[in-house]
Amino acid sequence: MADLNVGVVVFPGSNCDHDTEYAVASFSGVKPVMLWHNEHDLKGCDAIILPGGFSYGDYLRCGSIARFSPIMREVIDFAGQGRPVLGICNGFQVLVESGLLEGALIRNAGRKFICRQSTISVVNNSTIFTDRYEKGEVLRVPVAHGEGNYYASVETIDSLESNGQVVFRYTDAEGNATAEANFNGSLNNIAGITNKQGNVLGLMPHPERASEELLGSGDGRRVFESLFAHLAGTKRSSRGCCSTSPTRRSAS
């Protein structure tokens, strides 16, 4: 994995950048490249992660200012090439504001900031971010957000569901998508989605905060393991007869 480069974008107000750096480095031995918001160069990174936090103080709306930062122009181009982009919490909000993912993230149904352990189920394990999981597997991953309520038009929700773009869903410990498990009010209990191509994932729960048992759960670690397995496979292919890029695969 030594020849893999992963970039972690740092906005003013990011506060999970070093958590993400640690989660990646702890199992891969790869120290991520920290990319400041005003940079114009992704420095040869193979994947980009937008971490959690409160970019630009969450002024106007979460992620609405970060979308205009110079680095995001590069990230948008990078994603357009089919390259992997992962947005966690505020990173998910930035991806939505940037148009890389559909829908919106609005105030939690109870109008309060929520910081707690959540249980989510793997809806689609046929993505480059989730293929180390079993379909239907229930994970314990913490959340910390005030605007994590996923909202979209009926047509968009139907499209996300039918295309296998819903990747994680808030559920109870048995995997049931109940109203009680849906603490922020997200439509269809949606906790994470991809774009149609499957190379961009946004989720509100924090996998980097569930990357080892010492933290209370190691269930989030396989998001990063799945991504690195994909990157390593792509590197091997590019050295062989041809290169590959992430494509949308249907849920198994």
Swiss-Prot record:
Provide the alphabetized UniProt keywords.
ATP-binding, Cytoplasm, Glutamine amidotransferase, Hydrolase, Ligase, Nucleotide-binding, Purine biosynthesis
Listed CDD domains: GATase1_FGAR_AT
Which residues does the UniProt record annotate as the domain Glutamine amidotransferase type-1?
6-237
Record field: catalytic activity: N(2)-formyl-N(1)-(5-phospho-beta-D-ribosyl)glycinamide + L-glutamine + ATP + H2O = 2-formamido-N(1)-(5-O-phospho-beta-D-ribosyl)acetamidine + L-glutamate + ADP + phosphate + H(+); L-glutamine + H2O = L-glutamate + NH4(+)
The biological process GO terms on file are:
'de novo' IMP biosynthetic process
Q: Which SMART domains match?
A: GATase_5
Matching Pfam families: GATase_5
Is Nucleotide-binding a UniProt keyword of this protein?
yes
What EC number(s) is this enzyme filed under? 6.3.5.3, 3.5.1.2
Q: Where is the active site?
A: 89 (nucleophile), 206, 208
Q: Does the keyword Cell cycle apply?
A: no
Q: Which Gene3D superfamilies does the UniProt record give? A: 3.40.50.880
Localization (cell) = Cytoplasm
Give the CC-aspect GO terms: cytoplasm
Under Gene Ontology molecular function, one entry of this record is: glutaminase activity
The record's annotation in InterPro entries points to: Class_I_gatase-like, PRibForGlyAmidine_synth_PurQ
What pathway does the annotation place this protein in? Purine metabolism; IMP biosynthesis via de novo pathway; 5-amino-1-(5-phospho-D-ribosyl)imidazole from N(2)-formyl-N(1)-(5-phospho-D-ribosyl)glycinamide: step 1/2
- What's its job? Part of the phosphoribosylformylglycinamidine synthase complex involved in the purines biosynthetic pathway. Catalyzes the ATP-dependent conversion of formylglycinamide ribonucleotide (FGAR) and glutamine to yield formylglycinamidine ribonucleotide (FGAM) and glutamate. The FGAM synthase complex is composed of three subunits. PurQ produces an ammonia molecule by converting glutamine to glutamate. PurL transfers the ammonia molecule to FGAR to form FGAM in an ATP-dependent manner.
Please describe the quaternary structure of this protein.
Part of the FGAM synthase complex composed of 1 PurL, 1 PurQ and 2 PurS subunits.
NCBIfam families in alphabetical order = FGAM_synth_I (TIGR01737), PRK03619.1 (NF002957)
What is the name attached to this protein's record?
Phosphoribosylformylglycinamidine synthase subunit PurQ
Name the gene behind this protein: purQ
